[in-house]
Amino acid sequence: MNKIALIYDFDRTLSPKDMQEFHFIPSIGYKKAEDFWKDCADNAKKRHMDGILSYMMVMLEKHPHLTRNVLKEEGKYVKLYKGVDTWFKRINAYGKKQGIEVEHYIISSGLKEIIKGTSIADEFKKVYACSYAYDNEGNAIFPARIVNYTLKTQYLFRINKGVLDEMNDFDLNRSTPEEEKYIPFANMVYFGDGMTDVPSMKVVKNNGGYTVAVYDSAKQKTALAMELKKDKRATFALKADYSKDSKIEKTVKGIIDSVASQNRLEKFK
């Protein structure tokens, strides 16, 4: 198999904060992001609802005119970790040199429309994230799709089978011989930052793939990444630095080398 999938969470994995915190939350009158998230948590508890649905509901209630374009514009304010802007070009080029096609995917509990507005949106073969339904004028009216920490695993199987269309459940659930799988789990690398990524990490790692717990310079985040590695949820725990010659780059290049070597060995069977 000459393909490898690099699969990323978004918030605090490719970006140092939750995507709403850069501009959206201040724009609706909050001075502190934690106050917004507390309102979301309180709303979820009060209504006994999913936390992701709750934040989408609060965003819709607090913003006077939430549209597809408004959300996409929010993507322009999202900052990325060091090196992310050139990461894809470097890794793609290295994969090509080794005879490996690298595909990039997002599986995020954040908002698809905001991700689509970021500077790296075009780097991904597919973005799986939460989204709203819109009326004919483009106004958000209701959550259309949510991606919580357990639902994330569905999209790993979509990538595995090559059934990328979210509306195609028939082919996703149909039995597929291993030799017909689009990208085997052994050729996947999942990047995440915390406990909400554990189900996805377990699926990938238990099926022979690689998982990377990333952390920033904050002590608490570092400890969490190390805990994920200790508990064998993460194969690697690495600082969220995607720049040239960083540990993440060297690690992913090593994985690409391993896949390429395995492909060469398979030819002798």
PLM segments and residue spans:
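Alpha-helical substrate-recognition element adjacent to the catalytic core
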Residues: 1-136, 228, 234-235
